[in-house]
Amino acid sequence: LTLLRSVQVSNMEMHNGKWNRFFGRRLSEITIGIIGVGRIGTGVIRNLQGFGSPKILVNDILPKYSLDQDFNIEWVDQDEIYQQADIVTIHTPLTAQTKNMVKKEQLLCMKEDAIIINTARGGIINEQDLYEVMQSGHLSGAAIDVFDFEPYYGKLREIKRCILTAHMGSMSVDCRTRMEIEATEEAVRFLTNQPLEGVVPEEEYAVQREGL
């Protein structure tokens, strides 16, 4: 939303004594591509329902067609997401399959005014390729919360239309408290031979076994 409405640019200009107003786009009028439809990706789909009826394209290595009963989504391959989406948001784990999944080839397939978001894991988007593509003027914005190496001091800091945050996705007191409670409760269930609630599906675990 910040990138769609140039909020970060307006904020900087206001602090510099400038009064400029920017045309943006409404979320309900664009196409959103979601790569990775696990718990978080599904949550993104759910949250988007409050913004009208954007077209939602989704892709996952293990499609969950049951979601079609609750949401108006379209399952497509990744290439179609890169080519059609106005916003591409990544919600996959970092695996051998997703390492450098988004390279220059994929970025240049995106619309010139598209936006890409990565709040999943560093290393999924090739940072050097993203820098070079954005430096050339392609893409209207990027929002990156995770990096190959953290703390991040790389070249993307030079790109003003690239919003960078310091891996802050779970950085709220209530979220961290909930994480600690859930981890403790799951450990207790394991140690007392009770059914577990956070089991990784075997098919996903098989992918993780392949390593990076």
Enumerate the language-model features and the residues they cover:
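Rossmann-like adenosine-cofactor binding region
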Residues: 62-155, 171
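Phosphate-binding beta-alpha-beta segment of Rossmann-like dinucleotide-binding domains, i.e.
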Residues: 1-31, 43-46, 51, 196-201
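Conserved S-adenosyl-L-methionine
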Residues: 50-55, 136, 140
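Structural/interface elements that position substrates and couple domains in central-metabolism enzymes
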Residues: 4, 57-59, 64-66
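Short, structured coil segments at secondary-structure junctions
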Residues: 52, 71, 158-160
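Glycine-rich Rossmann-fold phosphate-binding loop(s) that bind the pyrophosphate
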Residues: 37-38
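Phosphate-coordination loops involved in phosphoryl transfer and adenosine-cofactor binding
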Residues: 28-31, 53, 104, 113
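C-terminal helix-to-coil terminal segments
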Residues: 150-212
